[in-house]
């Protein structure tokens, strides 16, 4: 809900060296910018094998040197796009914006077909994600903290203690998220990467997720699958609404994490109260170039992005659009 373009790349395409870990099985860097062109240009200087991150070895020989070369305003003409209907039907305004975007794709020459994700995957994806993330966080965050300067926490227990102090006396204007503190406790006490459940999920569950999603793309002969990046409109900034909203909805974005496959977000429109809605283009491993082409064509066909009204140019500045 930011009103700009962004890419969650194929896992291993970009180095994670120096990034605070949440779960290295899912973590990745990714560029964000006003337009798809800017995101593609940023990728040119971000890709490459990094000796400090062994995951990038998977990208050797598979990354491109100029992602802007893929940008084509006519890329939707002849493309075959799947729309994941499982993530629509939770917010009328979001649905309307996405349907308008699908109409724009059709008008640009794309064939748009409905697809459905396997029911077991929709039911199990949260458990898969939590099983991996909760068990990886403690050892990985502590390995990261060990390299910091003196004065910083060294263990998850120390992080929890500092979090409690912040929660007891929040900074002025701050709204602490109690769910984050609760997750610290769960991540402290929920197994390790050595236990059988983690090994089962990591060795068998994640490859199964990836195989099913790649199979969905292949079986329907798709260039990409699209869905609302968030099936419901954004909440009010600075107001914590708890772990469940009045109209809870599933999210497709964690499937990109579970599978390690790329997800390009492009502005799709705005709600009646001017909040941004994004559309995700999901594809095969190392298909970033094709996703950039499709996302750029969609961006040029719709031209819906607006500059933020609360951050105008400062005196003497000119914002390049």
Q: Which residue ranges define each predicted feature?
A:
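Hydrophobic alpha-helical scaffolding
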Residues: 29-32, 74, 87-95, 127-135, ...
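Generic recognition of stable, solvent-exposed alpha-helical segments in well-folded globular domains
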Residues: 34-41, 83, 93-100, 132, ...
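Glycine-rich, small-residue loops and helix-cap segments
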Residues: 124, 177-321
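Sec/Tat-exported extracytoplasmic proteins
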Residues: 18, 46-50, 85, 109, ...
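A short beta-alpha structural unit
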Residues: 86, 121-130, 164, 234-235, ...
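Short helix-loop capping/hinge segments that flank enzyme active sites or metal/cofactor-binding pockets
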Residues: 70-84, 134-209, 267-275
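Acidic-enriched catalytic cores of C-N bond-cleaving enzymes acting on peptides and small amides
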Residues: 35-65, 88-123, 133-166
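Structural helix-boundary/capping segments
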Residues: 1-85, 99, 103-107, 146, ...
């Amino acid at each position: 809900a930011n009103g700009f373009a962004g890419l969650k790349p194929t896992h291993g395409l970009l180095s994670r060296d120096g990034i605070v870990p949440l779960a290295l099985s899912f973590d990745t860097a990714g560029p964000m910018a006003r337009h798809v062109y800017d995101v593609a240009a940023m990728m040119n200087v971000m890709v490459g094998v990094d000796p400090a991150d062994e995951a990038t070895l998977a990208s050797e020989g598979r990354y491109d040197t100029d992602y802007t070369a893929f940008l084509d305003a006519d890329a939707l003409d002849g493309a075959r796009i799947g729309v994941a209907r499982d993530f629509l039907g939770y917010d009328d305004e979001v649905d309307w914006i996405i349907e308008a975007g699908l109409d724009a794709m059709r008008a640009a020459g794309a064939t748009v077909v409905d697809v459905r994700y396997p029911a077991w995957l929709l039911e199990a994806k949260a458990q898969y994600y939590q099983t991996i993330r909760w068990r990886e966080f403690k050892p990985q965050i502590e390995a990261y903290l060990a390299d910091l300067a003196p004065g910083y926490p060294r263990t998850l227990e120390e992080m929890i203690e500092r979090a409690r102090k912040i929660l007891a006396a929040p900074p002025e204007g701050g709204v602490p998220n109690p769910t984050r503190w609760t997750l610290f406790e769960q991540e402290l006490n929920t197994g390790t990467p050595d236990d059988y459940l983690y090994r089962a999920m990591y060795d068998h569950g994640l490859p199964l997720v990836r195989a099913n999603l790649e199979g969905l793309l292949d079986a329907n002969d798709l260039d990409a699958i699209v869905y609302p990046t968030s099936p419901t409109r954004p909440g009010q900034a600075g107001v914590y609404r708890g772990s469940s909203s009045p109209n809870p909805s599933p999210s497709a974005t964690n499937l990109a994490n579970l599978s390690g496959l790329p997800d390009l977000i492009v502005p799709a429109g705005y709600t009646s109260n001017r909040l941004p809605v994004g559309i995700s283009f999901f594809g095969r491993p190392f298909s970033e170039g094709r996703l950039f082409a499709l996302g750029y064509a969609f961006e040029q066909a719709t031209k819906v992005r607006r500059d933020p009204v609360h951050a105008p140019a400062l005196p003497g500045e000119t914002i390049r659009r």
